[in-house]
């Protein structure tokens, strides 16, 4: 793995030079730190692999071993800075999903060089048409980010409470053991009973003692119930969404002129698929099942078994006359 990490220009490898630091730019090709200083001494230059104009201040340490992944991540970050609309800005969920699909298409085209010029013009046109919306969404914190921050804040508070509770319990237990030891010594000194009775009585009293209770300090809240310092506040009303008719699945019926094929459960119980080749692991991963092949063969075998031309002759003649 260390031999694969090499500079394409000077051929230095991580194996021969453990301190080798590979840098990557927007084009996705890597260069070592020494080559970057030599080629981009004036602040700008071209990539030796693809001749793309680059700037020296845009080089950064490579995070992924695959250069394509590094390039795609960089493109995604740049595109999402401009294509930053949220779901609340769309009247319907379908419009938002189409918007996300358009973003993925743009990222794919830029990363793979497909329709590069047309995609760049499309991005530039979007920036011009949505300049105000882009700046507004950049300044406004999205609800998802605020929700994550709220979760992190709550998680930190819970961890702090558990830590305080554990420290309190340890202190109380240590002090209680010290007091019990002193009380036992006093009883042994001043009591007239035998030492065995004193120790047994003391042990019974210790077991009956209740565990110390840790009381959390009350959190400061407003009259509305909002916590002080809670960062997430929804200051904008949601855009009313269009009511859409829910999709209802209706199974289609086909006229096969034959007996109906068995159901999927009957294929296993009645052993229809006994002599069907089982699906391979690759086929199962792709959604294939041996029941599909068995059911298709049965449907083809049963189709047309109950078709009698004499019964359908008049129907076929009338349909042909209407067509003519």
UniProtKB/Swiss-Prot annotation:
Gene3D superfamilies found in the cross-reference section: Zinc/RING finger domain, C3HC4 (zinc finger)
ZnF (RING-type) residues: 7-51
Chief location: nucleus
GO process terms (BP): cell division; nucleotide-excision repair; regulation of transcription by RNA polymerase II
Quaternary structure note: Associates with CDK7 and cyclin H.
Entry's Gene Ontology molecular function annotations: cyclin-dependent protein serine/threonine kinase activator activity; zinc ion binding
Subcellular location: Nucleus
InterPro entries: Cdk-activating_kinase_MAT1_cen, MAT1/Tfb3, Znf_RING, Znf_RING/FYVE/PHD, Znf_RING_CS
Taxonomy, superkingdom: Eukaryota
Zinc-finger listed as a keyword: yes
Coiled coil location: none
Presence of the UniProt keyword Zinc-finger in the record: yes
Protein name: CDK-activating kinase assembly factor MAT1
Keywords: Cell cycle, Cell division, Metal-binding, Nucleus, Zinc, Zinc-finger
Function field: Stabilizes the cyclin H-CDK7 complex to form a functional CDK-activating kinase (CAK) enzymatic complex.
GO cellular component: transcription factor TFIIH holo complex
Pfam entry (one): zf-C3HC4_5
């Amino acid at each position: 793995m260390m031999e694969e990490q090499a500079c394409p220009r000077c051929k230095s490898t991580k194996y021969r030079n453990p301190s080798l630091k590979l840098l990557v730019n927007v084009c996705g090709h890597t260069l070592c730190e020494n080559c970057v200083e030599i080629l981009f001494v004036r602040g700008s230059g071209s990539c030796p692999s693809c001749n793309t104009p680059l700037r020296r201040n845009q080089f950064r340490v490579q995070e992924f071993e695959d250069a394509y992944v590094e390039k795609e991540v960089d493109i995604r970050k740049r595109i999402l800075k401009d294509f930053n609309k949220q779901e609340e800005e769309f009247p319907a969920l379908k419009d938002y999903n189409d918007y996300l699909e358009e973003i993925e298409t743009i990222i794919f085209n830029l990363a793979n060089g497909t329709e590069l010029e047309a995609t760049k013009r499309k991005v530039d046109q979007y920036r011009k048409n949505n300049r105000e919306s882009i700046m507004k969404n950049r300044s406004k914190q999205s609800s998802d980010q605020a929700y994550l921050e709220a979760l992190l804040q709550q998680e930190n508070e819970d961890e702090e409470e558990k830590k305080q509770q554990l420290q309190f319990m340890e202190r109380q237990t240590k002090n209680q053991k010290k007091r019990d030891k002193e009380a036992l010594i006093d009883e042994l000194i001043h009591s007239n009973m035998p030492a065995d009775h004193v120790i047994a009585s003391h042990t019974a009293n210790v077991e009956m003692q209740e565990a110390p209770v840790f009381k959390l300090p009350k959190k400061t809240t407003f009259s509305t119930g909002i916590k002080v310092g809670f960062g997430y506040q929804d200051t904008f009303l949601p855009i009313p969404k269009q009511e859409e008719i829910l999709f209802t699945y209706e199974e289609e019926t086909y006229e096969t002129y034959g007996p109906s094929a068995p159901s999927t459960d009957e294929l296993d119980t009645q052993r229809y698929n006994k002599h069907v080749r089982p699906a391979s692991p690759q086929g199962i991963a792709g959604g294939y099942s041996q029941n599909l092949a068995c059911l298709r063969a049965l449907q083809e075998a049963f189709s047309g078994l109950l078709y009698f031309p004499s019964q359908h002759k008049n129907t076929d003649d009338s349909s042909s006359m209407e067509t003519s």
